[in-house]
Every structure is written in structure tokens, then in C-alpha cells.
Amino acid sequence: MIGRLRGAVAEVGEEEALIDVMGVGYLVRCGHRTLQRLPALGEETLLHIESQWSESAGLRLYGFLTREDRRAFVLLQAIQGVGPKAAMAVLDVLSPAELASAVAREDKAAVGRANGVGPKLALRIVTELKDKPITDGPVLMSAPTSSAPSAPAKPAPTGDAVAALMGLGVAEVNARRVVEAAAAELGEEATVQALIKAGLKELGR
């Protein structure tokens, strides 16, 4: 099974992207957040892949910019009633860190903002993901700062910055290191663009 793809972004659709790897095009299903964070057409990206096989659909590839995104996708599908579509929907409104925070707070309303996830399924998700390693970092107990509960959750700036640097070919460990250093220096008000710029400067690019 395919676990990772590095190649040029050839096409981007509403639910999938075509990644050109040495002349071979791989059709990869991605969530909306992932698609929005892909580099421009023709530029190189790295996607962590979850390969799934079924008799009806054959082999399908699901792509993520970070290993945490892929891990959360797999953990969500271990829950009864959560398939690939619902798992993608959850990760479209909550990053892995935000999902871990919602689970820790038993905030089913946050999970329930995902398209197609009703109250019962949202409750099952926050219950069954208890003590699961959704993210590598510490779990924040604070609620999202958005004043409109029905609005999609804002992606974590550090996570977006790390993903952007990885899309430029920076190794994940180095991307996390420079982004975390930049976040500590710039403070919590730092924008994604500021973190990326500081990270690239630290890397000498």
C-alpha cells in the first residue's frame, strides 16, 4: 500500500488532487482544508497517504499534509458510523489539535459542526476518542475563540505554517522546529504568513 507521495500538483478538484510523481498521476482524495493549503499547480508537495481497498471502489488514496491529520483520519474511522466522508468532514472543521481539545472537553457541539455528523454521532466520537493519541503535542482545554458556534473552526496557524513549509519540501521535523520557534518569538497573534516567513528565514531560504 502507498504511504506517502511526493510530487507536483497537477490538478486540484473539489474533493481530490492529481499528484504527478515522475510522470505517473495519482488521484488523491483530500479534505477541503488540505486542498486549500496545497501549493500552486506545478509546485511540489508531500502528502501522507492512507490507502483503502474495497470490492466496490477498488483502491482509494486519501491524502494529508501531516501525519497527525492522517492519524486522526484513521482513528475517526475506527468509530462505528464514521466512514471516510464523515472523517474528512470532521477534519475540515477541526484540526487534530482542535479535535483533541474538543474530545478532552467532551464538546460534542464542536464535532457536530462537521457536515453529516449529527448529535448522536458527535457524542460517540468524543466518547470513543478519549485517551486516543490524536496529536503528539499537549492537549489544550480552552474552547475555540470563535464567537459564532456554527462557523467552521479556524485552522491552527502553527499547523498551517508547518504544512505550508512541508509543501515546499521542508522535512516535517525541521518545519515544526522553526515554526514553533517563530511562534514563541512572535506570540499568539502571529499570522500563518508571518510564521512561514520567519521559518523560511531560519532555514536560510
From Swiss-Prot:
GO terms for molecular function: ATP binding; four-way junction DNA binding; four-way junction helicase activity. Keywords: Cytoplasm, DNA damage, DNA recombination, DNA repair, DNA-binding. The keyword DNA repair applies. Residues 66-144 are annotated as: Domain II. Residues 145-153 are annotated as: Flexible linker. It comes from the Bacteria. Transmembrane segments: none annotated. One of its GO terms (cellular component) is cytoplasm. InterPro entries: DNA_helicase_Holl-junc_RuvA_I (IPR013849), NA-bd_OB-fold (IPR012340), RuvA (IPR000085), RuvA_2-like (IPR010994), RuvA_C (IPR011114), RuvA_C_sf (IPR036267). SUPFAM superfamilies: DNA helicase RuvA subunit, C-terminal domain, Nucleic acid-binding proteins, RuvA domain 2-like. Belongs to the RuvA family. The RuvA-RuvB-RuvC complex processes Holliday junction (HJ) DNA during genetic recombination and DNA repair, while the RuvA-RuvB complex plays an important role in the rescue of blocked DNA replication forks via replication fork reversal (RFR). RuvA specifically binds to HJ cruciform DNA, conferring on it an open structure. The RuvB hexamer acts as an ATP-dependent pump, pulling dsDNA into and through the RuvAB complex. HJ branch migration allows RuvC to scan DNA until it finds its consensus sequence, where it cleaves and resolves the cruciform DNA. HAMAP family: DNA_HJ_migration_RuvA. NCBIfam families: ruvA. Has three domains with a flexible linker between the domains II and III and assumes an 'L' shape. Domain III is highly mobile and contacts RuvB. This is Holliday junction branch migration complex subunit RuvA. The lineage of its organism: Bacteria, Pseudomonadati, Pseudomonadota, Alphaproteobacteria, Caulobacterales. The gene is ruvA.
